[in-house]
């Protein structure tokens, strides 16, 4: 590579962040619709603020879903169960404004029985471009900064829910990780870690400064050092823990939350392009979601097969049309075995069917088993082995295509 050493940063937020509360409610609603009717068409958006939840969007389904119950159950499981949070699962208002999907969209997406190939009958739910990415930074083939950032807030939530240590934790938190890379795009060290977590008021007899010092030490020892490999931390690594001090007011009372506002947290932490479409609350006929999952699957299998150290995949669609308008693969000059990007792309297009119904069937997106959409709505949609688009079952086929 021609560039010199450089720094790269990614952030994440916990399940208690207001935007993630919204994402999880939207996906919990989607899960229930799909459970009752796998052919449900759902576009569910959620707004949360002080003492209030609004769920809106468009649905075509045979299912009947109790929005109140799902919203309150989700909020309870996240941990907003106390009146002092000013957003409480038992007392907040829940307004449902879901209505029927436009028949104009339905007509383009739903099956056209006169077409012979079943996978050609189901068109994309919208136009747009989606990206997938993989690299050799981590065993999960994810960029390291976002992977560590996700794990930090996930562990923080686990500690909070366990309730054995750090019992002052409240649900809202954020993380940020800055890595230093060498000239060959290999991670050298962690330069900085930022963690901000909501917490209870300081205990009686303890000053704010003393309490923040306790929080800082707890997070460094019980969270950061458990997540970040020790060899990446050195004497120059900086830890910024609750850098503004007190963080008692948080969650939907501190900031309004909306579905779909954490699309970089949901994906690759800025290490790869993003087509702009959010995931949560959307059924799998919407290629914003399903094709992004498929593009990750393609990229991950290419890297796992040893064809490249990095891979970006772009796929684009026209509404109502099943076959992608375009497919683009870029290995960023890291291709192996003398393979060009065009050679890799030609074989990948033959191996991976990127028509919407083919994607849905490959990953059972209309009948999730062993996972649910709400699982995806916090801590990232990628780099987590429970999801079917993370499988590398196409590695042998890719290698065989090149005689490897």
Swiss-Prot record:
Binding site for L-methionine: 58, 101, 255, 286
Entry protein name: S-adenosylmethionine synthase
Region annotation (Flexible loop) ranges: 101-111
Gene Ontology CC terms: cytoplasm
Cofactor(s) the protein needs: Mg(2+); K(+)
Catalytic reaction(s) noted: L-methionine + ATP + H2O = S-adenosyl-L-methionine + phosphate + diphosphate
Main location class: cytoplasm
Keywords tagged on the record: ATP-binding, Cytoplasm, Magnesium, Metal-binding, Nucleotide-binding, One-carbon metabolism, Potassium, Transferase
Superkingdom as given in the UniProt entry: Bacteria
Similarity-based family: Belongs to the AdoMet synthase family.
HAMAP family listed in its UniProt record: S_AdoMet_synth1
EC number(s) per entry: 2.5.1.6
Biased composition (Polar residues): 1-13
Binding site for ATP: 17, 172-174, 246-247, 255, 261-262, 278, 282
């Amino acid at each position: 590579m021609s560039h010199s050493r450089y720094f790269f940063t990614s952030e994440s937020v916990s399940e208690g962040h207001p935007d993630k509360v919204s994402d999880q409610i939207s996906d919990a609603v989607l899960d229930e619709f799909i459970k009752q009717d796998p052919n449900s068409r759902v576009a569910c958006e959620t707004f949360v603020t002080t003492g209030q939840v609004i769920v809106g969007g468009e649905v075509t389904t045979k299912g009947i879903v109790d929005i109140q119950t799902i919203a309150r159950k989700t909020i309870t499981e996240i941990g907003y169960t106390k009146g002092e949070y000013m957003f409480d699962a038992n007392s907040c208002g829940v307004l449902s404004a879901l209505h029927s999907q436009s028949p104009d969209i339905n007509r383009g997406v739903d099956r056209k029985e006169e077409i012979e190939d079943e996978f050609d009958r189901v068109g994309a739910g919208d136009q747009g471009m989606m990206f997938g990415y993989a690299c050799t930074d981590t065993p999960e083939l994810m960029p390291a900064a976002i992977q560590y950032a996700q794990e930090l807030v996930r562990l923080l939530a686990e500690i909070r829910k366990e309730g054995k240590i750090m019992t002052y934790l409240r649900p809202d938190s954020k993380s940020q990780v800055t890595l230093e890379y060498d000239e060959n795009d290999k991670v050298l060290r962690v330069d900085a870690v930022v963690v901000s977590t909501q917490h209870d008021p300081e205990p009686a007899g303890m000053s704010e400064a003393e309490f923040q010092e306790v929080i800082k030490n707890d997070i460094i020892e019980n969270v950061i050092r458990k997540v970040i490999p020790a060899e990446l931390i050195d004497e120059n690594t900086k830890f910024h823990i609750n850098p503004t001090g007190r963080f008692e007011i948080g969650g939907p009372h501190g900031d309004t939350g909306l579905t779909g506002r954490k699309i970089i947290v949901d994906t690759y932490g800025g290490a790869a392009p993003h087509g702009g479409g959010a995931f949560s609350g959307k059924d799998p006929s919407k290629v914003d979601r399903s094709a992004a999952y498929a593009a990750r699957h393609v990229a991950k299998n290419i890297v796992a097969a040893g064809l490249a150290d990095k891979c970006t995949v772009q796929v684009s669609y026209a509404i109502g049309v099943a076959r992608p308008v375009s497919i683009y693969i870029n290995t960023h000059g890291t291709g192996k075995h003398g393979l060009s990007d065009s050679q890799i792309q030609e074989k990948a297009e033959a191996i991976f069917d990127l028509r919407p119904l083919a994607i849905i069937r490959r990953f059972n997106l209309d009948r999730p088993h062993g996972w649910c959409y709400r699982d995806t709505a916090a801590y990232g949609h990628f780099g987590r082995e429970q999801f079917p688009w993370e499988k590398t079952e196409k590695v042998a086929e890719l290698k065989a295509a090149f005689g490897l």
